[in-house]
């Protein structure tokens, strides 16, 4: 062979061998550092009443704060025997123990081990035999503890020994009602429980008893239930039981593809000797987005399907990349590159199951760039993955070029998702420098995601003293020690941590009121008009409000509003409308004086992507993300992100101890609202048929109360207070009734108020300022044996001491007699005095 031919062949062979060796060495140093999310491993515990599952519990890998773990409640009958089943999913269980504690976690009531344990095919059945020490009708916390290897897995629920068989009857009824919604003969059963058809007849997302029978029975959707039904008691009391049912249904799409929906039914039921009353029935239906299904509509929009209109989404500057959240999943659509990415999801590739699909987490999007990269926050219970069985807040970065997500920090928490959402949902923001901002324990924190060190920026936050913009980029506050008497508002742009001070004009105080979109709203009141009323509450009558532009730090004034009548008491903002609640002075105090409104007519005209809706015969209302630039539905690629493997944990410790009393409004096990203002919580709970609990899980308000309360007797004014005003005498009679015969006049002469006099005297009780409530709402406290102090004029007051179905009883301290008024007359009487009420509850 010619040497000139051999030489190139040899050289080529040597080069190829060297290339192979180099590739091997390089690959050894550059292993794939990404992985799919780990599958769920923790067992599920179920409790049964008769043959019905009444609780499905998910496990926690660390001890939780019992006072912040309030979801379902398990009824125990007179046998005090609790049957349970454990789906182990192959997890080896070596022991089953339990503890029963008081709701405030101040005492251990009982503990023991499960008995009659049997195991078969990854399922364990056992019984908890509860000692005869539970007070009937009293709530406790039950913790089931599974020993698995060296670890303990805890399961939390409330527990109550019921006084009758109503709970079983209510559960049976709820399951029967549920079954009839799928049946062709539903008209034989459901109509007798329906209200007049006055509800929205154009949606299947939300259905209640005021909708049509056609909607309650799914209209033309024809869904099929998939998998097990998850039933749970949420409230059990003498007046009603609350039950929820969760399940998944499937339907066929227009192209024959399978569509999945999460469904929740809510029942508030009252059982009497004669019949069952359906006080409330609600059903929500929410579509689970599937990227593999056709989701681009004929007019090139992203079809999200049947769901509510409040969509969490963010778009890139050009509008070509859209990130959105649906049913606990984060998706990203890249219009230019024609791809859809499942960025974050607990749902596995093998289908929908009870562990992956548990709805106790949420996602907040911080930002999206043109490359499709996203900063986002996942908070709540972690269904699977590295933090399975933990509750916490994780900050992630998704790289749109290589389709990986990397955890930047994880803040573990010992409270339930519902409490975490209420606490942290107020503000979560990640800026481009990698600084994460959040509010926890009435403090504004910043956390550098590289250094992972928390810093307190503002502390002692009160709800009335700060506001957050819709995007969470802007935070406005006044110092808490200057509530209602501040001449400066601090406005922080969290994008760059800059602070701009807004200063009041001479002779005025200013207060942050809110944001419309990203524009800041604040109000001003004359210093000499801000007053502390006779009852001790502060009135801040604003002479005007100002809307300030925050874009590009311009801080220009967009609008100043002055009411044509009265003063501004407060505002509320919805979409692009500011509703102004006016007040006026009447007889020395302020009362409501109607409303006014300011509309932002520009609205969302400059938005690259907006929310739209369509109505069809089969699915009724569906929602879409409307893009100004269309998308090609023919060649969309679907991708799933992978997680970057971490060498070390990225946990950040942030102390979460409530420094002030908080009130939580619960409905169907969900926290609707959390606030430090009890009156606001009561109004919310009343409007939504909910309950209010405090930071120790103690009920502080519910709609359920006795049908009548005899007027309290033995009310008398302390001798030292008999010559004082009726305000002083009313407080004196309240304290005397409680067994504290102090001179109220002396307390008030020394600078006190009726409110402070009650607080400083009844130290073993919870004193509540329930000003702003109606007569109907304050009667809960009377039914609990507590008189309610009520202002009737500038310097006059009475005590509400009883009620019937049509009237209230009140003690008049000036005549030392008990009188009555109809609800209507009493409500009008108290409304003209400003709805000023105080009361107390024994701890």
Pin down the residues of each PLM region:
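Exposed beta-sheet edge and beta->alpha loop/turn motif
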Residues: 240-278, 282, 812-814, 820
């Amino acid at each position: 062979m010619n040497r000139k031919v051999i030489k190139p062949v040899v050289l080529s062979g040597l080069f190829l061998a060297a290339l192979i060796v180099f590739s091997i060495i390089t690959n050894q140093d550059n292993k794939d550092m990404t992985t799919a999310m780990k599958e769920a491993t923790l067992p599920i515990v179920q409790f049964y009443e008769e043959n019905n599952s009444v609780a499905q519990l998910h496990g926690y890998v660390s001890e939780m704060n019992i006072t912040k773990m309030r979801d379902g409640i398990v009824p125990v009958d007179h046998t005090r025997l609790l049957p349970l089943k454990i789906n182990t999913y192959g997890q080896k269980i070596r022991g089953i123990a339990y503890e029963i504690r008081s709701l405030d976690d101040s005492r251990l009531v009982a503990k023991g081990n499960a008995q009659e344990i049997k195991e078969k095919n990854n399922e364990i059945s056992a019984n908890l035999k509860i000692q005869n020490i539970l007070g009937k009708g009293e709530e406790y916390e039950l913790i089931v503890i599974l020993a698995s290897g060296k670890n303990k897995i805890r399961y939390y629920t409330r527990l109550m020994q019921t006084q009758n068989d109503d709970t079983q009857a209510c559960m049976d009824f709820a399951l029967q009602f549920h079954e009839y919604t799928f049946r062709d003969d539903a008209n034989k059963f459901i109509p007798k429980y329906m209200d007049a058809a006055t509800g929205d007849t154009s949606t299947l997302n939300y259905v209640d008893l005021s909708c049509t029978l056609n909607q309650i029975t799914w209209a033309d959707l024809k869904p099929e239930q998939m998998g097990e039904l998850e039933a749970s008691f949420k409230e059990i009391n003498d007046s009603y039981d609350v039950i929820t049912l969760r399940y998944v249904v499937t339907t066929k799409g227009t192209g024959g593809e399978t569509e999945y929906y999460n469904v929740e039914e809510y029942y508030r039921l009252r059982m009497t000797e004669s019949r069952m009353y359906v006080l409330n029935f609600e059903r929500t239906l929410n579509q689970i987005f599937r990227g593999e299904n056709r989701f681009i509509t004929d007019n090139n929009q992203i079809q999200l399907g049947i769901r509510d209109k409040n969509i969490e989404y963010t778009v890139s500057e050009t509008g070509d990349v859209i990130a959105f959240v649906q049913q606990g999943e984060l998706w990203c659509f890249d219009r230019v590159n024609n791809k859809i990415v499942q960025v974050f999801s607990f749902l596995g590739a093998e289908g929908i199951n009870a562990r992956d699909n548990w709805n106790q987490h949420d996602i907040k999007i911080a930002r999206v760039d043109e490359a499709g990269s996203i900063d986002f926050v996942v908070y709540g219970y972690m269904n699977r993955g590295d933090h399975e069985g933990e509750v916490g807040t994780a900050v992630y970065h998704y790289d749109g070029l290589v389709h990986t997500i990397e955890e930047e920090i994880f803040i573990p928490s010992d409270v339930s998702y519902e409490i975490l959402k209420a606490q942290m949902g107020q503000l979560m923001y990640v800026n481009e420098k990698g600084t994460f901002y959040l509010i926890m324990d009435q403090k504004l924190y910043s956390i550098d995601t590289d250094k992972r060190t928390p810093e307190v920026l503002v502390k002692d936050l009160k709800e009335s003293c700060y506001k957050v913009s819709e995007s969470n980029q802007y935070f406005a506050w006044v110092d808490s020690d200057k509530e209602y008497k501040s001449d400066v508002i601090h406005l922080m742009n969290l994008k760059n941590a800059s602070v701009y001070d807004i200063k009041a004009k001479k002779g005025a105080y200013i207060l942050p009121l809110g944001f419309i979109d990203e524009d800041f709203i604040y109000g001003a009141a004359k210093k000499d008009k801000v007053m502390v009323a006779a009852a001790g509450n502060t009135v801040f009558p604003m002479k005007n409000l100002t809307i300030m532009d925050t874009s590009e730090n311009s801080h220009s004034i967009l609008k100043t509003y002055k009411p044509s009548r009265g003063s501004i008491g407060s505002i509320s903002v919805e979409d692009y409308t500011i509703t102004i609640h006016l007040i006026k002075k009447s007889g020395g105090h302020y009362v409501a004086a109607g409303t006014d409104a300011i509309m932002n007519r520009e609205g969302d005209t400059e938005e690259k992507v907006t929310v739209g809706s369509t109505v069809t015969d089969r699915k009724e209302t569906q929602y879409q993300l409307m893009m100004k630039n269309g998308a090609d539905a023919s060649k969309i690629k679907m991708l799933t992100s992978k997680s970057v493997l971490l060498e070390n944990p990225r946990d950040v410790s942030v102390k979460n101890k409530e420094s002030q009393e908080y009130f939580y409004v619960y409905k169907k096990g969900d926290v609707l609202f959390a606030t430090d203002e009890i009156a606001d919580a009561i109004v919310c709970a009343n409007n939504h048929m909910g309950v209010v609990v405090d930071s120790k899980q103690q009920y502080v308000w519910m709609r359920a109360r006795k049908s009548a309360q005899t007027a309290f007797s033995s009310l008398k004014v302390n001798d030292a207070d008999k010559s004082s005003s009726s305000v002083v005498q009313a407080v004196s009679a309240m304290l005397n009734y409680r067994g504290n015969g102090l001179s109220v006049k002396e307390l008030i002469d020394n600078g006190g108020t009726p409110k402070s006099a009650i607080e400083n005297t009844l130290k073993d009780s919870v004193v509540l300022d329930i000003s702003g409530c109606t007569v109907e709402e304050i009667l809960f406290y009377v039914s609990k044996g507590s008189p309610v102090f009520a202002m009737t004029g500038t310097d006059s007051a009475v005590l509400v001491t009883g009620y019937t179905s049509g009237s209230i009883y009140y003690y008049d301290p000036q005549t030392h007699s008990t009188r009555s008024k109809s609800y209507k007359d009493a409500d009008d009487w108290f409304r003209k005095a400003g709805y000023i009420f105080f009361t107390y509850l024994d701890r």
